[in-house]
């Protein structure tokens, strides 16, 4: 249990942790590379440990930051913990392991949909069973198919899985109704780091990517994480001034969009090569569709709770993340005395002065961190009964938070 009393001042500097999304991609591409790779400064969290376990199960050796890929992937039991990225990429990559692989996870992950990836595996001649975890894949070892189509309106993670598979075998990947497009761009950017060549074209609601085979062993330095840094950037926009280092100015991460949103909110945003700095100023209401950056939704709801007016925050896949994030934030904002109306795809939020509250995290790391940021400016003491969920993506979050509380 964590008790938060609003501090007198919020100001300081933190270093953004390594990116979870890039860490996943770097490890899976290292698994399929032609020789050893170095994944430099990876994020170590529950989700990325699941990916480390997965690539080892497929036959890779990992010694400190060096990944030695196997000559051939071996079929195995993959336990993805609560990591949707680990599970979905493993389902696709296991098609290269000749034999039966089973991909499973914890109860929370077992509730998330897997049928789109399973259906697309069948298109390339790979039998797979399961609409949700556990999923059983009957790997072929060698795949002769030349193209695949994946519906990505619920998640871009299977699209990433097929792009990583394509980097190994060569494949035309058609992504239908892609949601979270920046995550696909992040996958392509990481593939480039591993020497993968590709061409892409946009055709109406389809993104078509022609990927040449060949993943080269490389030294891949994991960039800082805009998703985790967003917690502190939002805190700066609301309460004081915070500087975050280790963020790439030209990154394609989806959650880099937080910088544009904070400018719209009225905050002072300074972007340099060495850091990003955000200082509080105005608190304008927001109207945002976060379908391309769903992990920002809880923090955008926090911004809206303090805004001067009515905000609308929407996103297509918000109900099928680690929790139903729309409902989760509606519950918590209501407990903080903020008027909120739940929509099918988002929230209407009438901003004001949140009061101290007893939060409910729904065992969702993003909700937990957002509630901590919400509590910093609330009128009175707030209680967050569960904080273990942050281990999924940002184990040192509360230690870093203490650096900016005066």
From Swiss-Prot:
GO molecular function terms listed in the Swiss-Prot or TrEMBL record: 3-phosphoshikimate 1-carboxyvinyltransferase activity
GO biological process, one term: chorismate biosynthetic process
Pathway noted in the entry: Metabolic intermediate biosynthesis; chorismate biosynthesis
Subcellular localization(s) per the UniProt record: Cytoplasm
Domain of life: Archaea
Entry binding sites for 3-phosphoshikimate: 20-21, 25, 155-157, 295, 317, 321
Residues that bind phosphoenolpyruvate: 20, 84, 112, 157, 325, 366, 392
Catalysed transformations (reactions): 3-phosphoshikimate + phosphoenolpyruvate = 5-O-(1-carboxyvinyl)-3-phosphoshikimate + phosphate
Active site as annotated: 295
EC number(s) on file: 2.5.1.19
Entry-linked InterPro entries: Enolpyruvate_Tfrase_dom, Enolpyruvate_Tfrase_sf, EPSP_synthase, EPSP_synthase_CS, RNA3'P_cycl/enolpyr_Trfase_a/b
CDD domains, alphabetized: EPSP_synthase (cd01556)
Keywords: Amino-acid biosynthesis, Aromatic amino acid biosynthesis, Cytoplasm, Transferase
Top-rank EC class of the record's enzyme: transferase
Primary residence: cytoplasm
Gene Ontology cellular-component annotations: cytoplasm
Oligomeric and partner information: Monomer.
Record function comment: Catalyzes the transfer of the enolpyruvyl moiety of phosphoenolpyruvate (PEP) to the 5-hydroxyl of shikimate-3-phosphate (S3P) to produce enolpyruvyl shikimate-3-phosphate and inorganic phosphate.
Entry-linked HAMAP family: EPSP_synth
Record-stated family: Belongs to the EPSP synthase family.
Name this protein carries in UniProt: 3-phosphoshikimate 1-carboxyvinyltransferase
Organism: Pyrococcus furiosus (strain ATCC 43587 / DSM 3638 / JCM 8422 / Vc1)
